[in-house]
């Protein structure tokens, strides 16, 4: 609260009144003045003190690696230690101020001062079991996620403090870079995750000689970027979002205000993967698959929810994402009602042979079966609430949930919002899926 003259209302309250002893007037006056003095302190009590973190990343195509420097400044003494979870085959050559302790898969850094710095090298080349890559640096471009350059970390710091972080890149000549963050006028990226006290880079990033298309769709600032000559359909992706981002925001009103979509061709992984405020999709992936679902919309559901599944419940998260990739296109008019029903028939048939849902990672047939189960959940919710509630109401709450998503959590949310127990039982998946197979045919 700004300091200034006491206003006339307060002065009037401090004047003696008939029948009020003089000592009482003085006590009232004193209490009012003390409250005015304390008010500014109270208004700042919830403001956390900040320490500054700067991440500098120098990309080197010749060695397929990056040199990373972390600088702590402005009250860096608030940070007692940072423990990084590393892969010794990927992260190496840790040096810095204070004390550094190496273990098998961790590096413990104690800055021990008002300022601190740490440097290390990281390889940007991660090959999946398929032989394709989800992180790669070439002569002309580099595609990676934030955790590929700054590993996962735990931090011990003074209570009531948080970081104020920036990210800068040093790039080869003629390269540019995109990341899922706003930029300062200096060109540095502002790293700000509201739910974290130590902000480090996350999400997909692309550097190199690239083509970029940008637009604001339904209030979301969208960037679509891909290396030149990769065959990525940037304008097609923007058009797809122009049709479907509206229905997404109706279900997920807290969708990130910025969205980055990066794309590339071979030898990158031929699929799609989400990250905070961003996603990657292979240049050859269709906007709409033959079964009527959309890889991009599927990943956007993950971006919107940021949900984690409990062990054995990955099918639930993947089923929700696949269900809505189809549902959003029905709502937007991208596909017809008949095509929508036909797609559900195809997915139900595909999932018929699945006997177990509790696999570690949901795959095609399991996810197809999960879609039918989510559809059954939606139908039961509508039936028991006379169309006042549906699966949207469940999913919105799951998006706000900070813990693991489970079937029991879904059932408890449903009971709370409807007041009744659900008949929906994923353990009886064979019976439920058979019911979902009925629909309107279309060639």
What is each residue range found by the language model?
Residues 27-39:
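Bacterial N-terminal signal peptides
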Residues 38-49:
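Bacterial Sec-dependent signal peptides at the C-terminal "C-region" and cleavage site
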Residues 49-51, 59-60, 65-71, 82-242, ...:
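Non-catalytic architectural context of zinc metalloproteases
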Residues 277-349:
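Zinc-dependent metallopeptidase catalytic helix centered on the HExxH motif
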């Amino acid at each position: 609260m700004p300091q200034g003259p006491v206003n006339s209302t307060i002065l009037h309250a401090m004047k003696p009144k008939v029948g009020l002893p003089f000592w009482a007037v003085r006590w009232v006056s004193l209490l009012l003045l003390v409250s005015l003095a304390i008010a500014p302190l109270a208004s700042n009590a919830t403001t956390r003190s900040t320490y500054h973190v700067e991440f500098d990343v120098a990309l080197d195509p010749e060695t397929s690696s990056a040199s990373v420097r972390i600088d702590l400044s402005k009250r860096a003494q608030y940070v007692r230690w940072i423990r990084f979870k590393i892969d010794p085959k990927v992260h190496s050559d840790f040096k810095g101020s204070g004390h550094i302790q190496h273990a098998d898969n961790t590096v413990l850094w104690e800055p021990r001062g008002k300022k601190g710095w740490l440097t290390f090298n990281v390889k940007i080349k991660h090959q999946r079991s398929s032989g394709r890559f989800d992180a790669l640096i070439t002569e002309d471009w580099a595609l990676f996620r934030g955790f590929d350059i700054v590993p996962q970390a735990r931090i011990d710091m003074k209570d009531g403090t948080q970081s104020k972080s920036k990210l800068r890149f040093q790039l080869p000549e003629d390269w540019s870079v995109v990341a899922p963050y706003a930029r300062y006028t200096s060109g540095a990226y502002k790293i700000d995750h509201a739910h974290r006290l130590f902000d480090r880079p996350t999400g997909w990033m692309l550097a190199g000689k690239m083509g970029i298309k940008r637009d604001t769709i339904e209030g979301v600032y969208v960037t679509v970027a891909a290396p030149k000559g990769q065959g990525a359909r940037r304008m097609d992706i923007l058009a797809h979002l122009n049709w479907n981002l509206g229905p997404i925001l109706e279900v997920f009103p807290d969708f990130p205000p910025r969205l980055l979509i990066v794309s590339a061709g071979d030898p990158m992984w031929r699929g799609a993967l989400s990250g905070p405020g961003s996603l990657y999709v292979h240049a050859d992936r269709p906007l709409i698959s033959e079964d009527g679902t959309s890889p991009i919309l599927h990943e956007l559901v993950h971006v919107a929810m940021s949900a984690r599944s409990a062990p054995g419940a990955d099918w639930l998260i993947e089923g929700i994402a696949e269900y809505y990739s189809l549902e959003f296109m029905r709502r937007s008019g991208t596909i017809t009602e008949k095509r929508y029903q036909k797609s559900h028939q195809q997915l139900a048939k595909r999932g018929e042979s699945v006997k177990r849902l509790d696999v570690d990672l949901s795959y095609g047939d399991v996810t197809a079966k999960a879609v039918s189960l989510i559809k059954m959940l939606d139908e039961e919710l509508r039936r028991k609430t006379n169309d006042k509630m549906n699966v949207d109401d469940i999913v919105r709450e799951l998006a706000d949930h900070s813990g693991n998503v489970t079937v029991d959590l879904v059932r408890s949310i449903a009971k709370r919002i409807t007041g009744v127990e659900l008949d929906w039982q994923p353990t009886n998946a064979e019976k439920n899926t058979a019911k979902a197979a009925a629909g309107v045919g279309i060639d």
